[in-house]
Curated annotation (Swiss-Prot):
Belongs to the NadD family. Pfam families: CTP_transf_like. Its EC number is 2.7.7.18. GO terms for biological process: NAD biosynthetic process. Pathway: Cofactor biosynthesis; NAD(+) biosynthesis; deamido-NAD(+) from nicotinate D-ribonucleotide: step 1/1. One of its GO terms (molecular function) is ATP binding. This is Probable nicotinate-nucleotide adenylyltransferase. NCBIfam families: cyt_tran_rel, nicotinate (nicotinamide) nucleotide adenylyltransferase, PRK00071.1-1, PRK00071.1-3. It is an enzyme of class 2 (transferase). Catalyzes the reversible adenylation of nicotinate mononucleotide (NaMN) to nicotinic acid adenine dinucleotide (NaAD). It catalyses: nicotinate beta-D-ribonucleotide + ATP + H(+) = deamido-NAD(+) + diphosphate. InterPro entries: Cyt_trans-like, NadD/NMNAT, Rossmann-like_a/b/a_fold.
């Protein structure tokens, strides 16, 4: 099947700091699904998270450093400019106005999908985008009734649908699930333990220069 309109992807998160556990799956999804661009979107205030440990500017700059050599990855700063909690549905409405003819793929992990029915206005989200679910190989279905029904209705196994249909599909993509977390990195730094090979060197150097997470 020919691709009619190459989709774009969005990956949101606190990224405090960004690390290879974010970056490797993002790259794999971009390549596997032939996304024309993947936008890394740091949250300003995530409704379900406590205050971050680096400022919005610092988190943004770390993302830019981490993806500086990836031609198909860029940062989207819109949520950092908000002065209120950022909900996914609000961002998707903005994006659909900006990209009216381009399929939008919103990327999330399996843990987010499992609790998807707790998201603000969750039933409307698939009216603006496709959902790409990043998961480890061999995952098992643990959905509740509502999420299970949503998946049954909207799932596709044909990645061409993500380009040829504007919105409304759920696609599962196996990715490398690296056992790295931002919390772990902050804890190691607080204990003066090296974080080499957990995040790009450019991010490590920035953390040192800014004296973050101490």
């Amino acid at each position: 099947m020919d691709i009619q309109q190459q989709a774009i992807g969005f990956l949101g998160g606190t990224f405090d700091p960004i690390h290879f556990g974010h970056l490797r799956p993002a790259l794999e999804i971009t390549e596997a699904l032939s996304l024309q661009q993947l936008f890394i979107m740091p949250n300003h205030i995530a409704p379900h998270k406590s205050a971050s440990h680096a400022s919005a500017r610092q988190r943004s700059e770390m993302v830019e450093l981490a993806i500086s050599h990836q031609a198909r990855m860029t940062i989207d700063k819109r949520e950092l400019k908000r002065h209120k909690p950022s909900y996914t549905i609000d961002t998707l409405k903005e994006l659909k106005i900006e990209y009216p003819n381009t399929p939008i793929c919103f990327i999330m992990g399996m843990d987010s999908l499992i609790s998807f029915d707790k998201w603000f206005d969750w039933k409307s989200i698939l009216s603006y985008c496709h959902l790409i679910i990043s998961h480890r190989p061999g995952w098992q279905n643990k959905f509740n009734k509502q999420v299970g029904a949503l998946v049954a209705k909207h799932q596709t196994t044909d990645k061409h649908d993500l380009h040829n249909i504007q919105f409304g599909k759920i696609y599962f993509q196996a990715t490398s699930q690296l056992a790295i977390s931002s919390t772990e990195i902050r804890t190691l730094l607080n204990q003066d333990i090296s974080i080499d090979f957990l995040t790009p060197d450019s991010v490590i150097n920035y953390i040192k220069e800014q004296h973050l997470y101490k």
